[in-house]
Structure formats: C-alpha cells, structure tokens
Amino acid sequence: MAAQDAAVQSAGPAVDPVRDTGHDSVRDREIDGEQRHLDQVYRRLEEKIHEAEFLMHDAAKRGQVGTPGALAERDAQVFRAGIHLNRLNNEFEDFLFGRIDLLPGKDGQKGPDGAYTSVEPADDAIRSDRTADIAETLHIGRIGVLDSDYSPLVIDWRAPAAAPFYRSTPVDPGRVVRRRVIRSKGRRVLGVEDDLMRPELTASLGGAALPVIGDGALMAALGQARSHTMRDIVSSIQAEQDLVIRAPAASVTEVSGGPGTGKTAVALHRAAYLLYQDRRRYAGGILVVSPTPLLVAYTEGVLPSLGEEGQVAIRAVGSLVDGAEATAYDEPAVARVKGSARMLKVLRKAARGALEGASATASAPRGARTAATRAARSARGAEVQAGQLAFGEPAESGEVTAPGMLPAPADASSAPGEDVLPYAARSGRGGAPVRLRVVAFGRRLELEADELRRIRESVLGGTAPVNLLRPRARRLLLDALWSKSGAAGRHTDPELTAELRSSFDEDVTSEDSFIEFLETWWPELTPRGVLAAMADERRLGRWSRRILNQGETRRLARSLKRLGADGKGPLSVHDVALLDELETLLGTPARPRKRRELDPLDQLTGLEELMPQREESQRERAERLAAERTEYAHVIVDEAQDLTPMQWRMVGRRGRHATWTVVGDAAQSSWSDPDEAAEARDEALGTRPRRRFTLTVNYRNPAEIAELAARVLALAMPGMESPRAVRSTGVEPRFSVVRDGDLAETVRAEARRLLDRVDGTVGVVVAMGRREQAARWLAGLGERVVALGSLEAKGLEYDATVVVSPAEIADESPAGLRVLYVALTRATQQLTVVSTARDEPDPEGVPDLLRD
C-alpha cells in the first residue's frame, strides 16, 4: 500500500530544478530527441520487413513438388515468416511508448520473473553529494527491436528488463531515476510526460542535467477522452497491476478489485505477457471469457495492439458453444432457475427421458393401446400393411418434431389382429417402434414392446452419454434376437457357435429394416432437441419433480417455448450453458473422417503413384486446430463474479488441464446466490493452488463519483470497502428529476448536455426492460452516445454517464443494488442521475437510494 501511495503521489510534480516549467524549448528538444530514436526504430523495422518478405518469396520459389519432408519444411518457413511479417506490418499507435533512465546496477542479481537483471543500483552509483550519472537508457515498446549489431533499440514491454518501467516508485525506485511516457501517433512523436523516481538526486545524462517534462504520465493518461473501444494501458500500468500481469502462471491466479481498478485491462495484458514468456507452453491457446458481447467488442482490439493475435480467443459467455449465440434475454426469475446448479439434475433426467418417453407409452395396457389404435385408424380412414418392422409412419403434414427427438408419426399398424399404439410426441400425435420383427435363418423373430422396454432400461442404467450407449443397445437387441432364434443350441463346438452367431449378426444388421428400426427406436438426440422438448410443461414437470417447484417449472417451460418445435429459436446466455451441459450428457458419436477424394484422371495417367501425397501445412493445421479447439492451455475469466453455477461448469470444461486467471469483484455480482456460484467455481478450478491479488486504487472515477457510488455499496454489501479514487476533478454528480412525466425528453436533454461538455463518449444506463425505449430516446444524437441495459454496462467506461431511475435498476433482481453500483461507476469525468417519482427524490433531486 505504501508503494502504491507513492506511485499516486509521483503523478504530481517532483522537486527538480531542471523540470520544465513551460519553456517550449526544453520540451521541444526532448521531443526531437525521441523523434530521432523513433525514426531509427522504423528504419530498422523496414529492414526486417524486407527480410521477412524475402524469406517468404524464397520459400515459395522452392518447387511445388518434392518429398513430404521438404514440402513440410517449406510450409513451416512460410508460416513463420508470414507471422513475423504480419506483426511487423501492423502500424501500432504508440509503437514506442516508454523510456527509463537507469543508474549503474549490480551484476548477477536475480530480478523480476526470475531473470538475472540488475534491479538495484551499484554501491558507488550515488555520490556523497547526492549526484549521479545515468548509465543506461532503455526504450520500451510493444515488440522488441534490435539493431544490426543486435543491440536493443526497443525492449518488449513483457521482457524482464522492462519490469522497472512499471514497478518503480519513489519509495522503491531501484535503478530508475526518470520514467518517461512517450505519446506518438504513427511515426510522429506528439509529446512526453515524465515521472521522477529519485527527486532527491541531481542526475546527469551525457554531461547535462536530466530534464523532467510535464506533471506526470498517469494523470495525463487518465484525462484522455474515451471511445467505444478499449485502449491498452501498456504505457500507464501501475505497480500493483504489473505484479498481477507478471505473476507466474502455475495453478490459479485470483484477482479482486473494485470498479476502475483496471481488472479487465490487467487480464488482457496478462494474456499477452504469458504468450511472450512461454509461447510453446501456450500453443494450446488462451481463452478470455467476458460476460457480454458488448465487452468483447469493447476489448477485442487490445491484444492486437500489444503485438498478440491468433492464439488468444476472446469469447462472450453466450458464444462459448459452437453454433450457438445468445441473442435473447431471460427475466431475472427465469435466469435464477436456469443458472442454478439444480438444473444439472433436471438435464440428466431430460436427456434420458427424451429417449424413454416412447417405451412408457408403448407399455400401456393392451386395452388402452387397442382403443387408441382404433381411434387413430378411424381418424385416418385407412389401414397400412405391416412390414417386417412395426413402427409408425412419418408425421402428418404440418406436424413437426423437435430435432433429435423420437419421430412423431400419426399412425401405425401391424399384421392383422395385432395392435400398435401410436406414441404421442411433444408436438402432435406420433409413434415409436413398439415391435421389432426380423427374418433370420428362415424364422420370423419378434421382440415385443415389454422386451424392448426392458432392453432400453438396461442400457440406460449406466452413466455413459445417451448417444454413446447406442452400440450397447444394438448389441442387446441382437442378443435378444439370437436367444429367440434357438440357434445357440445347434452346435456343441464353441467355434462353430461363434461363427454362426457372427453370421447371424451380419445378416440382421445389414438389413435396411433393422437399421431403420434402430435409427427410430434409439435416435441420436441433439441438445437443441432436448431443450425444445423441455418446453412441454407436463414432460418438464416429470423431469423436474422434487427439484424445482411448480412456479419455477412453469416459468422455465414458458421461456423455452421461444426455441420453437425445431429447437432453432433464439437462445439466452443461460440457455447456452444448458446446451453445453446437454452436449456432455448426450455425447457425440464418433464420425468417420472424410476421405480425400481421388481424381480418376490421376489414376489413369499414373500421376497418383508419382506424386507424393500433400501433407497438411503448418498454417492449415494451426487454423484447423484453432477452429476445433474446445480446451485451452490458459483460461482468463473476466468479471467472474457474474458467472452462474451452470456457466462455471461450461467454462470449466474448456480448462480441465489449464492454468487460470480469475478476475472479479464480489461487490459487482449480478448473481443472486454468490455462495452457490463460489461452490461451482471451486469445482471448476479443482484443487489447484491459488495465488491472490487485490487491486485497491480506482483509476477511472473521480473522487466525487466514487463517493456517491460508495453509498450504494454500503447498502448492497455492508462492510465492503470501495477502491480509493486517485484523483478529484471538482465536478459533483448532477441530479435531474423528470418533470411533467416526460422521461424520454428529460433523458435526451441530459445526454445532449453531457455531449457538449465532454470530448468522448456518453453512456445512458437504464433498466434492462427499457433498452429499446432508451435507444429511441437518443436517436439522432450521434455515435458518441449509446444506450445500454444495466447488466450490459459491466466492464465498460465512458467519459460521462446518465443513470436513469436508480430505484428501477435496484428493483430488477435480488442483486439489483450491486447492479446499480456498477452503473454508477462507469464515468471517467461526469455523472448525471435522472430520477422519477419511483425514486422519491428530495428537493435537490437526490434519489432516496443515493442520500446519506
């Protein structure tokens, strides 16, 4: 804490006689010096780009044919050169952003991250008269650049040698005398801001006094206008943040911190740092999980700006499952049910119940079956001849069954005198196979409904995924038919019996009728199909008995109706977690790999024999593995406090063997049962050892806004301390009351007012149910203003914010006060609170929830 206080204090002016006090000549001279260095860096970058282009062209010119080994070597060289060229060609804003001026150091001392780097000054570095000479100057940038003699022109910000740029404070300066942040755009240096780490020294550089420009880099960075995308903080990382970014990756790193402490930025910079430190170890990919698509869009440009892209996947929780994208919103009561760990038991029953439904009806009393069959036949007005298999016909036109569920035929008939009950599927009348009839060894063999039901129950008695049990079901069907054939007793010789059995199995399983029966009796279920089946309240009631109450069951079934009978309707973020669980419970049968198609012309001409088969290139393999990847080497969870128990299970599957970084703040949690979520988180993380960090300084909000938000925090979580704001602007939050009931005009007027007062963005935060309304209120005000729901504001920041009706936001859910706390902490400069009668504002417009 002392070091952090010192870092904050260092943002103000240091005592130094050579500090620039407004003389442009000193500032211009320093900017010119940095410009010369930047020009040298870009000249070297151009040389490296030409080298990479030459390597690519040279490799490409090495014939298109050759041995598989030679072709693989060529592909690997092109792949590596292409990656290098892509990194070099990126025109990063602020490519070179920092510099540190260092005293002579002690040799051979282990420094940050285990590297042998001089971190402490030599004993004779500071003379008795408190003067010293600068021995070394390092420039810090997004990627490292060496000159032709392999001397560093730019140090990669992730390198151990760059650590003092972030960790040095006046209390613990190490070798650093001056830390400089360089602001540039493209190839032009715009300005410099210095922090003096040893103000008591008189330091010299090249025989001249060391100049210090500006009033501190941190304050300059905090005062910049915001856009709708997140900028990296690589030039303004503070000491406590740097400790997290460079923490060893073994096991689990947990990071807590209130609003504005830089948790999201730290998580993204940590991903870039880990790849730099051990790229081979993290070749399996790094997954960054964000709570909302808005936050993904806001942050996705950070990693490319840090020189990393390709091996890091940033995904919203609602898009973690292939082919699924959350676009719908669940009401809080429904979300509490879907996110609860209780849903695991419901889904387990649904996965099996979706398959067992057919046998339940098939085993009904014979009289009931007869009556139902006659009624169905009467309705159809026709009879159908029985084939080898007794099972229903396709559903009538207009009746649709859920994909992956049992077919829903409208009628079925058997041989004369035999009754078959049509099975009523969820979306209409229907039937499932109730009798298997085959001809083998000259005999007609039959398995009746009760026998089929017993076989199904026997197979489902295990715990394996339902779709993976199908081979066992097939085996038991064949066993039952073999037993009925009487062929087992024909021979006493076991070898002859085994040969006869093999022939029997081959004959039966090659028949289209048996294949068709198995496809219908034990179909491959799909997660969407089972989820759609759960929209039937009666069926869901059976599967959720003693797990959910009637009200919860009714609300859950009603919310799932939006999926439609085909299961292809819109999903919520909570539905996606249920789909992922069902994928595990159902399983996916192995699919045969698609064989390479052969060109008949190659065979005729003999080229097929002469040409080596082309192996998959390294680039193609990398792209394929990235697309197929479901597990990662490292998982970073942002805003972890918002994950539900079911979402923790989904994320946990993607990091079974991974190391983890978990970032969150309990005070901002929107989940109503934190204890249940904590239990699910512990299960996902397993028994791995944990290292914990806490970020304590609020770099986003001015003190005036932070103090107002702290009042809500005291109501939401008594005893919880809010982070300490690093600055004050003197601008108090504004309170506005809706007049004459015109909420839309009041909000629009306040948004317009803020647009005139800030250079960057304005966010208007409303209750989730008002999102579409709010967007209409702001129509025509321009791109700098955006409307968002209270749950969508997490992790975002704006120059100014309008929070509409605190009471309405707080009443949305049991976690409403915590959600309101988040909404109040989005602004970097100005905050306006709009109150309605529901907020009970006092004469000054302050709503009840925000009063002392």
Mark where each language-model region is:
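Conserved AAA+ ATPase small/helical "lid" subdomain
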Residues: 341, 345-462, 751
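Hydrophobic alpha-helical scaffolding
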Residues: 223, 285, 289, 330-340, ...
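Conserved helicase NTPase catalytic core signature
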Residues: 376-380, 385, 395-397, 430-634, ...
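P-loop NTPase Walker
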Residues: 2-16, 20, 24, 28-33, ...
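Short acidic (Asp/Glu) and glycine-rich catalytic loops that position anionic groups and cofactors
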Residues: 213-214, 320-330, 453-457, 493-498, ...
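Conserved helicase motor core of SF1/SF2 NTP-dependent helicases
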Residues: 284, 293-321, 325-338, 583-590, ...
